[in-house]
């Protein structure tokens, strides 16, 4: 992005996160073998930003329109483990790098980026820090960043159902407050692989099935709904997208007392596999993003 360039093309992909009542701000943290040198970490951050201009942006508003433009403010390394408010306390940046003793913290606002998109950038910061601190030789080429996908073309290819007051009203999942109880369940990767192989299913499906059984027993329910997300970069033709590029699916399973995983994991696994085909993922993206596109089309000039 050039210094004078202003763009709105990446806003759509994460705008639903921007207007949520509660911000989604994930955190990655890494414990190093030695105390972190903040000055070297700052140098690594500065160098990584030069290789990844997508992250060196701020958002500006003009009336009802939001744009991204290059951020001229310094991107600072913060001291301590407290997560700063992004972008209010981070000079307009939508991520933050902090350190305390031997731990490095990476915080990011789930608006311009998702976990898949931000990980190469955060990895680059660590690599450059290791180059400076320990004399390693990690390369520092520009980080690729795919252009925004064409939402208009996506919606045209997968037309949305007519949205009115009736179709927009959905049943709200009822919640209640009660005393929290915690239970720790230890599942190893090997045990999930074994369960999946035994039942001809993905380890992920085996995990979801076991969790559904446990939740059904814990909550005293005979049906459990579950959700999962799939990365859509390859399906959308944007393999190096830094922005949000996931779709979410929901399904459910009927339970009964004493039910075993092998009784239902087959159909569950088939549904998961079918939902993660490129065509299904593109259609789901159109369903998720279509309303954002339609609302934007209706705003006053």
Regions found by a protein language model. Give the residues of each.
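Acyl-thioester-dependent acyl-group transfer interface
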Residues: 1-63, 73-96, 216-301
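Short, solvent-exposed beta-strand edge segments and adjacent coil->beta transition regions
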Residues: 25-27, 101-103, 180
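Acyl activation and transfer enzymes in specialized metabolism, enriched
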Residues: 33-52, 107-123, 184-221
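Hydrophobic residues embedded in beta-strands of well-ordered beta-sheets
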Residues: 64-66, 104
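Beta-strand elements within well-structured catalytic alpha/beta cores of enzymes
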Residues: 104-108, 227
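Short, well-ordered alpha-helical segments in soluble proteins
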Residues: 125, 129-133, 215, 272, ...
